[in-house]
Design a protein with these regions (language model features):
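Amphipathic, Lys/Arg-enriched alpha-helical "gate/interface" segment within cytosolic domains
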Residues: 1-120
């Protein structure tokens, strides 16, 4: 499951996974951000903050995640991955080959630094 908040005045989406990601998470996320992107052209930033990656509930959740990324990565300027997870720390280096957005990793306790970077 994931929680999210769209900071409309800043154009920044905050995402906090707290359990295995579900297919419905990405439908809810798209329902929230798609109208904003349609009105504003893009998101200035996306912050993903989690102590560790919770995985996916099912194969359909994994497919929904990849589809969401494919449909939205060109519409997000920057992505901050805020985590101490060793697995997620390498995400920016891997995703850089597949995602148009600029990606940077921050330690879990550096949420404010990540938000400041997204606002640049």
């Amino acid at each position: 499951m994931m929680h999210f908040e769209l900071l409309r005045d800043r154009g920044i989406l905050l995402v906090t996974p707290d359990g295995p990601l579900e297919k419905s998470d990405f439908a809810r996320l798209a329902k929230e951000v798609d109208p904003f992107i349609a009105s504003n052209g893009r998101l200035a930033g996306l912050m993903i903050r989690t102590k560790s990656f919770p995985g996916w509930e099912s194969l359909s959740a994994l497919v929904s995640h990849f589809r969401f990324v494919a449909d939205h990565h060109r519409k997000i300027a920057r992505i901050a991955v805020v985590t101490d997870s060793e697995l997620l720390k390498i995400l920016p280096r891997i995703a850089d080959h597949f995602v148009k957005a600029e990606i940077r990793q921050f330690g879990f306790d550096r949420k404010d630094d990540a938000l400041a970077w997204l606002e640049l």
